[in-house]
């Protein structure tokens, strides 16, 4: 009897081991990174050209794959209350398909209300279990039909069977750049990313999207959409990413181009680490960037209301004003031949864990 039980237990263990090995092999087979310098086509291309001396509006908004309503928390986020209580997010997927669609439409309407000439959006799902297969890319492109657009994939993962009771699943997601003006070409540049055994299967395939627009007089307006790493202990990968971005910024300035780099920097870019009332301690992931960290001739266009309106909330707990930690991590870098004025938009974190940022600018 004992031998029989032992054989059964051994068989169960062997089957479990086969499943684990098979799953790891599946993840490894599915794993890849997109090549650097990948050219991307503009969909619905526009023909009007950008002009010097004319005022334009550009917007950036991380829509959080349509999951982050105010009552949402994300399983990978951790934190700590001021009294020392540890916190961790609960969910790996949107609360429901209905919530997903409501948040996506809410984000789209918020974007449309700003009437920007150029739009950067991050965490846009194209086909993902976490967003119930709601195609946010298609929804945004249809909703912004008067713009040319380009999509850069920066998250393509095999099926992640974790958390076990609510698996994150498979993901195809990325960034969308929209423009009412002619784009000459788009290039997806690869950021340095971690190749650690587990992390490489779960982290984004980080990139920045470079779009070149012709300007009267022979120069170019170079729009660079970025989404830097967040879950990077010690900030080493983020430092490498910033170094590469600075190389590109310096090269474009040498050529006399106009440059705007914007998006989700996952760093405090407005000296806002302790600007906003909070019942939580400052998260470990919050690092600071300022204009001194950028290539010569560049600056962060700090929003005039940066001390009043944050752009990002902690996702380890649902959002509650003056309780959940908030900070400014979204915005724009501009070259010194651009006049710019930015504003953080108070979206109340209703549809995303981010608020949009809008910048008015003029090419000098």
Residue ranges and their predicted role:
Residues 142-145, 170-186, 213-216, 320-339, ...:
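Conserved beta strand-loop-helix elements of the APE1-like EEP
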Residues 3-142, 153-162, 166-172:
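N-terminal, active-site-proximal structural segment of metallo-dependent hydrolase catalytic domains
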Residues 232-336:
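Metal-dependent phosphoesterases centered on the DNase I-like endonuclease/exonuclease/phosphatase
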Residues 37, 156-220:
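A well-ordered secondary-structure block
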Residues 198-200, 318-323, 346-350:
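Short proline/glycine-enriched turn/loop segments at secondary-structure junctions
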Residues 90-96, 124-128, 191-200, 227-236:
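Surface-exposed cleft-lining segments at the edges of enzyme active sites
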Residues 63-66, 124-128, 154-158, 183-184, ...:
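Solvent-exposed loop/turn segments at secondary-structure junctions
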Residues 57-63, 90-93, 103-133, 178, ...:
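Active-site beta-strand/loop signature of hydrolases that rely on acidic residues for catalysis
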């Amino acid at each position: 009897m004992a031998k029989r039980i032992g054989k059964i237990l051994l068989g169960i263990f062997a089957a479990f081991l086969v499943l684990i090995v098979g799953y790891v092999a599946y993840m490894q087979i599915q794993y890849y990174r997109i090549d650097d310098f990948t050219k991307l086509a503009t969909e619905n291309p526009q023909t009007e050209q950008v002009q010097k001396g004319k005022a334009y509006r550009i917007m950036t908004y991380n829509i959080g794959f349509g999951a982050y309503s105010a009552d949402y928390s994300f399983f990978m986020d951790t934190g700590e209350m001021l009294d020392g209580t540890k916190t961790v997010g609960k969910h790996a997927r949107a609360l429901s398909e209905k919530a997903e669609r409501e948040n996506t439409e809410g984000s789209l309407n918020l974007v449309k209300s700003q009437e920007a000439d150029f739009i950067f959006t991050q965490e846009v799902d194209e086909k993902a279990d976490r967003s119930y297969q709601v195609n946010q890319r298609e929804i945004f492109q249809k909703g912004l039909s008067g713009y040319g657009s380009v999509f850069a994939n920066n998250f393509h993962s095999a099926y992640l069977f974790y958390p076990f009771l609510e698996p994150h699943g498979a993901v195809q997601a990325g960034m969308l750049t929209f423009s009412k003006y002619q784009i000459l070409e788009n290039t997806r540049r690869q950021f340095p990313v971690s190749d650690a055994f587990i992390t490489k299967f779960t982290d984004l395939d980080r990139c920045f999207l470079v779009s070149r627009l012709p300007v009267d007089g022979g120069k170019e307006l170079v729009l660079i959409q970025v989404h830097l790493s967040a879950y990077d202990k010690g900030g080493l990968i983020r430092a490498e990413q910033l170094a590469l971005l600075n190389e590109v910024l310096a090269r474009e300035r040498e050529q006399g181009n106009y440059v705007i780099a914007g998006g989700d920097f996952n760093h405090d870019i407005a000296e806002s680490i302790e600007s906003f009332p909070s019942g939580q301690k400052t998260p470990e992931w919050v690092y600071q960037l300022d204009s001194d960290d950028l290539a010569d001739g560049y600056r962060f266009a700090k929003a005039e209301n940066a001390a009043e309106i944050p752009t990002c909330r902690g996702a380890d707990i649902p959002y509650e004003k003056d309780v959940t930690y908030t900070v400014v991590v979204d915005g724009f870098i501009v070259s010194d031949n651009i006049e710019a004025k930015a504003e953080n938009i108070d979206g109340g974190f209703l549809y995303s864990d981010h608020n949009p940022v809008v910048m008015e600018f003029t090419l000098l």
